[in-house]
């Protein structure tokens, strides 16, 4: 069991969740710096094992931080939270198609089993502390995310391809970015690829499948991390009758410090 942050550090995370519950919108990169963030996928109980097994077989893309049993809406990672209301935006899937984006999923919730999956926004604070830029934060944009041609390990009725997020990194800092993010395997860890996006089957960096187009400057290299939108790609491909997820880039902010997931204890 991970430890919750000291009370004074939890206030900002609680305030963020309260703001989203009250209707605030927008991506969560840079919100409550130093706190762990999580992707969300919620499915009916008869699909829960498939999703859990898919996550277990694809831990780089789907590192599970918490599982809420059917009917539970409060995560142990954020006492007093409600996963139906405390994210800025949700996607509602029916038969593998997004039918709606909503700021409150309460009306769609019927004893769903919920997985919270580690998000790479968590390691952006350590990157910034090391002087490595996080461009989408600088520009007030959502992180760019791309479908790849790399298949994930199938599980039960679920199959799909890996989704990655991309951050441009100065060429002379790539090794540092790899080392820093590698300390956080519970939030995707080290990159899965550095350099040519075509090696992942990505046709154009300028046209992400999710999020906003990036700005890559001279002397920077595109660096790609496994992404928690990967389960959504499996929903598109496998077409379960119903699911609710976070909208890409719109995460669940927890009361757990990023340092809790630093396997080196450096943070």
From Swiss-Prot:
<dbReference type="InterPro" id="IPR016938">
    <property type="entry name" value="UPF0317"/>
</dbReference>
<comment type="similarity">
    <text>Belongs to the D-glutamate cyclase family.</text>
</comment>
<dbReference type="Pfam" id="PF07286">
    <property type="entry name" value="D-Glu_cyclase"/>
</dbReference>
<dbReference type="InterPro" id="IPR038021">
    <property type="entry name" value="Putative_hydro-lyase"/>
</dbReference>
<dbReference type="GO" id="GO:0016829">
    <property type="term" value="F:lyase activity"/>
</dbReference>
<dbReference type="InterPro" id="IPR009906">
    <property type="entry name" value="D-Glu_cyclase"/>
</dbReference>
<protein>
    <recommendedName>
        <fullName>Putative hydro-lyase Krad_0534</fullName>
        <ecNumber>4.2.1.-</ecNumber>
    </recommendedName>
</protein>
<keyword id="KW-0456">Lyase</keyword>
């Amino acid at each position: 069991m991970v430890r919750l942050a000291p009370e004074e550090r939890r206030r900002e995370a609680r305030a963020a969740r309260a703001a989203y519950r009250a209707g605030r919108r927008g991506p969560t990169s840079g919100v409550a710096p130093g706190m762990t963030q999580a992707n969300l996928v919620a499915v009916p109980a008869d699909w829960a094992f498939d999703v859990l097994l898919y996550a277990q077989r694809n831990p780089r893309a789907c590192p599970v931080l918490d599982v809420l049993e059917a009917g539970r809406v409060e995560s142990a990672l954020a006492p007093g939270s409600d996963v139906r209301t405390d994210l800025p935006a949700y996607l509602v899937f029916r038969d593998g198609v997004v039918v709606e984006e909503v700021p409150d999923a309460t009306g769609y919730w019927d004893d769903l089993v919920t997985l919270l999956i580690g998000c790479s926004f968590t390691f952006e604070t350590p990157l910034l502390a090391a002087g490595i830029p996080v461009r989408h934060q600088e520009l007030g944009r959502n992180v760019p995310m791309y479908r790849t041609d790399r298949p994930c390990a199938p599980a039960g009725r679920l199959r799909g391809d890996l989704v990655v997020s991309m951050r441009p990194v100065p060429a002379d800092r790539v090794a540092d970015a790899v080392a820093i993010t590698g300390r956080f395997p519970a939030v995707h860890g080290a990159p899965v690829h550095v350099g040519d996006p075509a090696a992942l089957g990505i046709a154009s960096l300028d046209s992400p499948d999710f999020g906003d187009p990036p700005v890559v400057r001279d002397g920077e290299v595109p660096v790609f991390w496994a992404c928690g939108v990967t389960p959504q790609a499996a929903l598109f491909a496998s077409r379960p009758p119903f699911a609710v997820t976070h909208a890409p880039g719109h995460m669940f902010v927890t009361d757990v410090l990023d340092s809790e997931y630093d396997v080196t204890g450096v943070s």
